[in-house]
Swiss-Prot record:
<dbReference type="Pfam" id="PF13439">
    <property type="entry name" value="Glyco_transf_4"/>
</dbReference>
<dbReference type="GO" id="GO:0016758">
    <property type="term" value="F:hexosyltransferase activity"/>
</dbReference>
<dbReference type="InterPro" id="IPR028098">
    <property type="entry name" value="Glyco_trans_4-like_N"/>
</dbReference>
<keyword id="KW-1003">Cell membrane</keyword>
<keyword id="KW-0328">Glycosyltransferase</keyword>
<comment type="function">
    <text>Glucosyltransferase involved in the biosynthesis of the non-bilayer-prone membrane lipid alpha-monoglucosyldiacylglycerol. This is a major component for maintaining a certain anionic lipid surface charge density, for balancing the bilayer to non-bilayer phase equilibria and for keeping a constant lipid bilayer spontaneous curvature (curvature packing stress). Catalyzes the transfer of a glucosyl residue from UDP-Glc to diacylglycerol (DAG) acceptor to form the corresponding alpha-glucosyl-DAG (1,2-diacyl-3-O-(alpha-D-glucopyranosyl)-sn-glycerol). It can only use UDP-Glc as sugar donor.</text>
</comment>
<keyword id="KW-0119">Carbohydrate metabolism</keyword>
<keyword id="KW-0808">Transferase</keyword>
<dbReference type="GO" id="GO:0005886">
    <property type="term" value="C:plasma membrane"/>
</dbReference>
<keyword id="KW-0443">Lipid metabolism</keyword>
<comment type="similarity">
    <text>Belongs to the glycosyltransferase group 1 family. Glycosyltransferase 4 subfamily.</text>
</comment>
<dbReference type="GO" id="GO:0006071">
    <property type="term" value="P:glycerol metabolic process"/>
</dbReference>
<dbReference type="GO" id="GO:0046467">
    <property type="term" value="P:membrane lipid biosynthetic process"/>
</dbReference>
<dbReference type="InterPro" id="IPR050194">
    <property type="entry name" value="Glycosyltransferase_grp1"/>
</dbReference>
<dbReference type="InterPro" id="IPR001296">
    <property type="entry name" value="Glyco_trans_1"/>
</dbReference>
<dbReference type="GO" id="GO:0000287">
    <property type="term" value="F:magnesium ion binding"/>
</dbReference>
<keyword id="KW-0319">Glycerol metabolism</keyword>
């Protein structure tokens, strides 16, 4: 299969979306597929250094200077997509490259799948200070964009429910982004390495450690963690909070820690190298987050893969992820966070190896790649079915094809734009996928 991934955000820009796309690319290539990334130019990268990464001329996006917006080169992108003979397009943004991906898919008459990554209600205030787009407008803009895709990947149940509330009609599948487990399991990291890091950070023997690791922005709600941590210290003083990362809200947090008089128990590390991420997770007793703006949150998965339990604000996604007390504790109101921390410090059991291994496969990049590939197959089969149905047939012939769609593909399938899906049985669909897999090899 030849796959085009369209995104406004890719490395060297650092974000959860960029990480998710690179993970997907890696897993699809392991399965033997050819993957091409269509993205924006970047001043820190030679536009032509990788022939599988097609960079479209772009400028910084006015609301987010570290993000970019493509403004020309669309016809050239279509020409390249034709040359690469793409079978399917997978868009990862609702902005310039997302619109370009949908247009190219329609020109090539191939299906387009979209991943919805961001809850924009939490971010529209950045765009002209909320004067240009209001939160109430988001659902109409998103619904309009998704009207022209063949299916949507939702990284969590939160996103699926949100899009259902928006009255998005296309098929929605919950497929959480997986992570490369080997990057976080890291058996070469020994106890002495963890002890050395804790000593370097000023953590004493016998002290528990909470780790917050993210971009330091207001939306991450680290300020709520600091407030709760101040209450925790009144009950348990042998605990430290490590805040790792950098961002526009860092100085505000440092000032808040001073005002709460907890600065001696809070350690701000600044940005840490990606190669050290697993080391920090493993050196902590708990990963903690009070963010409510995540559609999934890869840091939760990274922490579990490192063997470190999580304390976080509960939601449908995390309710499924933190399915056992050994994986951590959830809370549902900011006033409950301090209590959740204290309970976790006292009552979290050790990790059970068997239960952990099952959870790790569930959140693995391998499982993620397989499930996305299955969605691609279903969309391609459906697209071929719709093309076949569109030929000059009589009404009776169309009905016959709908009921017994067996000519070249064996089965009828889901999804076509905003149209109702024709569902095949699970057995038929698996047979059809197997047929396509055989013909890809």
């Amino acid at each position: 299969m030849r796959i085009g991934l369209f995104t406004d955000t890719y490395f060297p820009q650092v974000s959860g979306v960029a990480t998710s796309i690179r993970t997907l690319k890696t897993e699809l290539e392991k399965q033997g597929h050819a993957v091409f990334i269509f993205t924006t130019t970047d001043k820190d990268v030679n536009r032509y250094e990788d022939w599988q990464i097609i960079r479209i001329p772009s400028v910084p996006f006015f609301a987010f200077k570290d993000r970019r917006f493509a403004y020309r080169g669309f016809s050239k992108a279509l020409e390249i997509a034709k040359q690469y003979q793409l079978d399917i397009i997978h868009t990862q943004t609702e902005f310039s490259l997302g619109l370009l991906g949908i247009w190219i898919a329609r020109e090539l008459k191939i299906p387009v799948i979209h991943t919805y990554h961001t809850q924009y209600e939490d971010y529209v205030h950045y765009i002209a200070k909320g004067m240009l787009i209001r939160p109430s407008m988001v659902k109409y803009l998103v619904r309009g964009f998704l009207h022209d895709v063949d299916g949507v990947i939702c990284p969590s149940e939160i996103v699926r429910d949100l899009l259902s509330d928006y009255k998005v009609k296309v098929e929605k599948r919950v497929i959480p982004t997986g992570i490369e487990l080997a990057k976080f399991e890291r058996p070469e990291i020994k106890q002495e390495n963890l002890k050395e890091l804790r000593s370097k950070l000023g953590i004493q023997d016998g002290e528990k450690t909470l780790l917050s690791l993210s971009r330091i922005s207001y939306e991450k709600n680290i300020q709520a963690v600091l407030v709760a941590f101040a209450d925790v210290l009144k009950e348990e003083d042998k605990v430290k909070l490590v805040v790792a990362g950098d961002g526009p809200y860092l100085n505000d947090l440092k000032e808040q820690a001073q005002n709460l008089e907890i600065q001696d128990s809070v350690i701000f590390t600044g940005m840490i190298a990606p190669s050290e991420t697993a080391l920090y997770y493993k050196a902590a007793d708990f990963f903690i987050s009070a963010s409510t703006s995540e559609t999934q949150g890869l840091t939760y998965l990274e922490s579990l893969a490192s063997g470190t339990p999580v304390i976080a604000h509960g939601n449908p996604y995390l309710n499924n992820l933190i399915s056992d007390k050994m994986f951590g504790a959830l809370y549902y109101g900011e006033h409950d966070l301090a209590g959740a921390i204290l309970e976790a410090l006292i009552a979290t059991p050790d990790m059970n190896e068997h239960t952990l291994s099952e959870k790790l496969y569930e959140i693995s990049a391998e499982n993620f790649g397989k499930r996305v590939h299955e969605f691609y197959l279903d969309a391609i089969i459906s697209n071929n079915f719709q093309k076949d149905l569109a030929k000059d047939d009589t009404v009776s012939q169309r009905i016959f094809k709908t009921v017994l769609y067996l000519p070249q593909q064996v089965v009828a399938v889901p999804v076509k734009g905003s149209r109702r899906m024709l569902k095949a049985s699970k057995t038929q669909l698996i047979s059809m996928r197997d047929y396509w897999k055989d013909h890809e090899e």
